[in-house]
Amino acid sequence: MAPFSFILTVLLYALTCSARALGHAHALLPRAGSLEQVTDFGDNPTNVGMYIYVPNNLASSPGIVVAIHYSPEGTGTAEAYYTGSPYAQLAEQYGFIVIYPQSPYEGTCWDVSSQETLTHNGGGNSNSIANMVTWAISKYNADSSKVFVTGSSSGAMMTHQNVMAATYPELFAAATVYSGVPAGCFYSSSNQQDGWNSTCAQGQVITTPENWANVAKGMYPGYNGTRPKMQIYHGSVDTTLLPQNYYETCKQWAGVFGYNYDSPQQVQDNTPQSNYATTTWGDDLQGIFATGVGHTVPIRGDDDMAWFGFA
């Protein structure tokens, strides 16, 4: 029989190795309660930055909110969206994780124009963001049925043009879109990344719900699964992305979901607040038009939580 001292030494060594391994595993995860950068989330074809907020009050099988920043004059960054939006505070209340992607381009707008980003697994910005989501689901045992996406301005365009219903519909359950344009509206025939499309921005790309739906569906050919429900905000005096884009975006998702755009179920004036009008086509589509509001419509965090099903 082995001496007791030898057995004790072996046990202590095993416990020490286990503790070190556990500590190393925890060290690989970002700290809770602060904005942290993640650099090893997987394939990142366009060098998009990943920042994450893990709440101190993390749920056992948490949801995920992807919050995509705006782009004006270089001020739109992951950190700016973290400090200027309510999602980190709401994460502490509801226990979900927030992913804040960071655009890789000078001026910090997103690529919503190239063929790569407008194609499922095409190697664009959208591909990188999708990989952030799958990484977070795996690392935190997140609930894959509770993954949501939101964004403002260029982030709104990335939200519904690329990452969400059009390009990665299988990843997301719902979205809120603040002051964006229809999916594919900024498409560049020269395949320019991070390209600006003045015709679209000025609200001059006008077509039918069926045509818009075909544009969105064409970004993931052959996909027949569920798509995230959409809540679309736009201001009546938006001079950056003119208000016609609101109507075209609503047309698009009415077409995608099979609703009759010209016959919504309900129109509610002064909802959710004075001078806002909410149009509901069905369970999967709402539009909120904000009279007197410019670019962008202010984030309504509590309403987002209700749309996502947290509240």
UniProtKB/Swiss-Prot annotation:
Catalysed reaction, written as an equation? Deacetylation of xylans and xylo-oligosaccharides
Q: Where is the signal peptide?
A: 1-19
Which UniProt keywords are listed? Carbohydrate metabolism, Cellulose degradation, Glycoprotein, Hydrolase, Polysaccharide degradation, Secreted, Serine esterase, Signal
Q: Could you tell me which SUPFAM superfamilies the record lists for this protein?
A: alpha/beta-Hydrolases
Q: Which Pfam families match?
A: Esterase_PHB
Pathway field of the UniProt record reads: Glycan degradation; xylan degradation
Which InterPro entries does this UniProt record tie to the protein?
Answer: AB_hydrolase_fold, Esterase_phb, Plant_Biomass_Hydrol_Est
- Where found in the cell? Secreted
Q: Name one GO biological process term.
A: xylan catabolic process
Cellular component (GO) terms are: extracellular region
Q: Active-site residues?
A: 153
Q: Does the keyword Secreted apply?
A: yes
Glycosylated residues, per the record, are 197, 224
Q: Name the EC number(s).
A: 3.1.1.72
What is the annotated quaternary arrangement, including any partners?
Monomer.
What does the UniProt record say this protein does?
Acetylxylan esterase involved in the hydrolysis of xylan, a major structural heterogeneous polysaccharide found in plant biomass representing the second most abundant polysaccharide in the biosphere, after cellulose. Degrades acetylated xylans by cleaving acetyl side groups from the hetero-xylan backbone.
Question: What family is it from?
Answer: Belongs to the carbohydrate esterase 1 (CE1) family. AxeA subfamily.
Name of the protein in its database record: Probable acetylxylan esterase A
- What is the name of the gene encoding this protein? axeA
